[in-house]
Amino acid sequence: MVDDSTRKTLSNIPLLQIRAGPREKDVWVQRLKEEYQSLIKYVENNKQSGSDWFRLESNKEGTKWFGKCWYMHELLRYEFDVEFDIPVTYPTTAPEIALPELDGKTAKMYRGGKICLTDHFKPLWARNVPKFGIAHAMALGLAPWLAVEIPDLIEKGIITYKEK
């Protein structure tokens, strides 16, 4: 089910060990530290391979995440706001990643711009609790979604390039 490129990307993202969500205040801080280390490593790997495609930051508690993601198509950079909350049942429940400005523009999206990850990503996440974290959600959830949906939305004229 996972291709060689995805397998290589995954093998370079550190796995997490601490099983804690926002409700476990003391241990959550340790989990957040692991999350940041994993994200930093993933972004560094992306930069080294020339495939840098997102920036994220969180609120102080690490429960709300926001930033930008972008997709290169025919040498044009399409940029989108990205946001998600960490569910109280995290890491058992994966975060629901949203691209609010694309809300209602594709069938593979729920209300509020949350991308559809049920078929492929959620079963994989469930098998890898607590080892998977935010970096894995970006690599296995948002990245493939962007790769499939954005070219289709561009081709249909639903989204257009915006000059900076």
Curated annotation (Swiss-Prot):
GO molecular function, one term: UFM1 conjugating enzyme activity
Signal peptide: none
Taxonomic classification: Eukaryota, Metazoa, Ecdysozoa, Arthropoda, Hexapoda
Stated family: Belongs to the ubiquitin-conjugating enzyme family. UFC1 subfamily.
Function: E2-like enzyme which forms an intermediate with UFM1 via a thioester linkage.
GO BP term (any one): protein K69-linked ufmylation
Database matches in Pfam families: UFC1
Protein name: Ubiquitin-fold modifier-conjugating enzyme 1
Record flagged with keyword Transmembrane helix: no
Active site (record annotation): 116 (glycyl thioester intermediate)
Entry keyword set: Ubl conjugation pathway
GO cellular component labels: cytoplasm
